[in-house]
């Protein structure tokens, strides 16, 4: 925690930030890596440090604040575009936030920096597979997703 070094970043803080990354990316029609890269390590550390208070705000306000603060722009990627032949259900932004939070948590060593792990996970090629809701990757067990991350592919 950059503001209170004696207070550790919790899994709930990580989950909130991953959820907001997903929500912001969907709102802007961007891939989640775009949001992560625009924030960068310092901003991710800040967001993780203040997640305990940010979760009290309306999520739409957090999206608007991130959009302004980090100069985020709209794109043309629609993660929610699915093929009805394969699935009829789109996971919620909270569900996908939890998927990414578990993955980030699983690869972060004890006492490690969640911001570094967020940057690493979201830059991984497996994110394109997780974010393809026509596949089953997003609802695979966490240990399978971690193995895929470590192997660089599903």
Q: What does each model-found stretch correspond to?
A:
Residues 53-92:
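Long, compositionally biased
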Residues 27, 42, 69, 102, ...:
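Surface-exposed polar/charged interaction patches
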Residues 29-37, 73-80, 110-115:
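Short, surface-exposed acidic
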């Amino acid at each position: 925690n950059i503001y209170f070094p004696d207070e550790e970043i919790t899994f709930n803080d990580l989950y909130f930030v991953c959820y907001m990354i997903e929500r912001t990316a969907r709102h802007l029609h961007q891939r989640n890596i775009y949001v992560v890269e625009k924030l960068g390590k310092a901003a991710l550390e800040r967001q993780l440090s203040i997640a305990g208070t940010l979760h009290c705000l309306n999520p739409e306000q957090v999206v608007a604040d991130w959009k302004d603060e980090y100069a985020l722009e709209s794109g043309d990627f629609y993660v929610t575009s699915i093929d009805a032949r394969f699935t009829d259900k789109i996971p919620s932004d909270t569900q996908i936030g939890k998927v990414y939070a578990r993955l980030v948590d699983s690869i972060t060593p004890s006492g490690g920096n969640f911001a570094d792990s967020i940057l690493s996970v979201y830059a991984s090629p497996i994110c394109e597979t997780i974010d393809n809701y026509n596949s089953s990757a997003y609802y695979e067990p966490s240990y399978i997703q971690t193995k895929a991350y470590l192997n660089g592919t599903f």
